UniProtKB/Swiss-Prot annotation:
It comes from Marinomonas sp. (strain MWYL1). This is Ribosomal RNA large subunit methyltransferase F. It catalyses: adenosine(1618) in 23S rRNA + S-adenosyl-L-methionine = N(6)-methyladenosine(1618) in 23S rRNA + S-adenosyl-L-homocysteine + H(+). CDD domains: AdoMet_MTases (cd02440). The gene is rlmF. HAMAP family: 23SrRNA_methyltr_F. Its EC number is 2.1.1.181. Disulfide bonds: none annotated. SUPFAM superfamilies: S-adenosyl-L-methionine-dependent methyltransferases.
């Protein structure tokens, strides 16, 4: 049942900071979402502004909301992930995809390359498979998702096999070399127009716990007592932390990308912490990247960004466009 509010006060009616093509710019229409996913009705409640919402501190509510969004906006009838795996906010994931489309368009006379000719590698796809779902359903791109976790790979396979709209468009590969990012999953004949990645942010489990507690203390300081200090969006160890944290992870990716310099148009990775950019830029300079771009994205109060780099020269770019982007 969708709740009715007597309070017309609203904090914000539109998420105007999101990408112009992002379908999640407006406030969630919970009536429509509940039609797509009836079980969502059990989680709908009124927030402090009198607007319909869900308890984002409740992992089950977050997962059910994601299921409804993926059904309603992207035609995905079945979507489920095991407990404890990353359950990401859909609007932010969609933003990355749309800005990646703009990145390709900037090299293609402003026209977004669409269809199965565009190949994308999602490094660390996770069990949720969200980036490939959005990228394929929005632009028709073909995806390979890699992950070190066999459960994540199996879950992606199940999601794809359970949705006819995704079959043949998304494949998941197990990364058996945990210290590698491209080696082991990038096959000899693979050519990718894009790579994308949401890298582990923290340097260790203890650092992650400290950061979570700090944020929780900040929430309590604002007298928001309904929040709980839980990882409401989940995440396994490989999804949340690694040696060297975000800066170390992306720098390793940059170094490894040199081996695939002429087999990818744009390598990209999210960078959550602005302070990590200088180290990443230094590594990009060291490896001789020809083009480097930093694209900022705003999502509510949060500013995020991704770094993109390419090794292609002008002649290679022209050849790529003429041979791979003509639908």
């Amino acid at each position: 049942m969708v709740l009715k509010s007597k309070n017309t006060k609203s904090k914000r009616t539109n998420k105007l900071e999101l990408h112009p093509r992002n379908p999640h710019r407006a406030r969630y229409d919970f009536a429509l979402l509940a039609d797509s996913c009836p079980e969502l009705s059990g989680f709908i409640q009124l927030n402090q502004y009198g607007n319909e919402s869900v308890d984002f501190a409740n992992p089950n509510a977050v997962k059910t909301l994601n299921r409804a969004l993926l059904n309603h906006f992207y035609g995905v009838a079945f979507w489920d992930i095991p407990p404890g795996y990353l359950c990401p906010p859909i609007p932010g994931r969609a933003d990355y995809i749309h800005y990646l489309a703009d990145l390709l368009a900037a090299s293609n006379l402003g026209v977004i390359p669409r269809g199965k000719g565009v190949k994308v590698l999602d490094v660390g796809v996770g069990a949720n498979c969200v980036y490939p779902i959005i990228g394929h359903q929005e632009y028709g791109w073909q995806f390979v998702g890699s992950d070190v976790n066999p459960v994540a790979v199996a879950t992606c396979d199940t999601i794809v096999k359970s949705n006819p709209c995704l079959k043949g468009a998304i494949s998941a590969r197990l990364q058996t070399q945990s210290a590698k990012l491209f080696d082991g999953v990038w096959k000899e004949k693979d050519r990718f127009d894009l790579t994308l990645c949401n890298p582990p942010f923290h340097t260790s489990e203890s650092a992650m716990i400290d950061e979570s507690q700090r944020k929780w203390r900040g929430v309590k300081g604002k007298k928001t007592t309904t929040q709980k200090p839980v990882l409401n969006f989940g995440g396994t160890a490989a999804e949340l932390w690694c040696d060297g944290g975000e800066a170390g992870f992306v720098s390793r990716m940059v170094k490894e990308s040199v081996q695939y310099a002429d087999r990818c148009f744009w390598f990209t990775s999210l960078v959550a912490r602005q302070g990590n950019l200088d180290a990443i830029y230094r590594t990009l300079k060291d490896v001789g990247a020809r083009q480097v771009k930093t694209i900022e994205m705003a999502q509510g109060q949060k500013i995020s960004r991704f770094v993109a780099w390419s090794f292609l020269g002008d002649d290679q770019i022209d050849y790529w466009k003429d041979n791979y982007w003509q639908n």
